[in-house]
């Protein structure tokens, strides 16, 4: 299957969902600067993109550059309830948002995760 995303991602769009994967990412350090990844077990890539998007919008390169395999027992295979907890933790602890905002962003992320599956995943 091939997973794509929106062609242009703004700060608002990035808080909706982490559209960017870290497998094949390039960013211009002269524009964005040095970005340190948050020291959290899960979603550290998302935490990084939330920092990047503060300085520049993101754009989709509409090419398949890599393959990604998920194996049994990997951190990427967590249960859905566990993923919800990690998203909440990201918004609450890393982004330092109030509880209600962290809950809202977590729920918003779930909704856009479903939209991504319906609209941006294609079986090849």
Q: Where in this protein do the model-derived segments appear?
A:
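Non-catalytic, C-terminal membrane-associated alpha-helical segments of glycosyltransferases
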Residues: 59, 65, 73, 77-124
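Conserved nucleotide-sugar donor-binding catalytic segment
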Residues: 1-82
């Amino acid at each position: 299957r091939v997973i794509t995303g929106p062609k242009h991602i703004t700060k608002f769009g990035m808080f909706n969902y982490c559209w960017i994967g870290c497998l094949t990412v390039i960013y211009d350090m002269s524009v964005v600067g040095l970005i340190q990844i948050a020291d959290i077990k899960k979603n550290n890539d998302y935490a990084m993109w939330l920092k990047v998007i503060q300085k520049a919008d993101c754009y989709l390169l509409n090419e398949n550059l890599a393959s990604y395999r998920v194996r049994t027992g990997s951190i990427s295979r967590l249960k859905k309830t566990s993923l919800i907890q990690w998203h909440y933790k990201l918004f609450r602890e890393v982004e330092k948002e109030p509880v209600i905002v962290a809950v809202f962003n977590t729920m918003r992320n779930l909704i856009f995760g479903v939209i991504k599956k319906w609209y941006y995943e294609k079986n090849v």
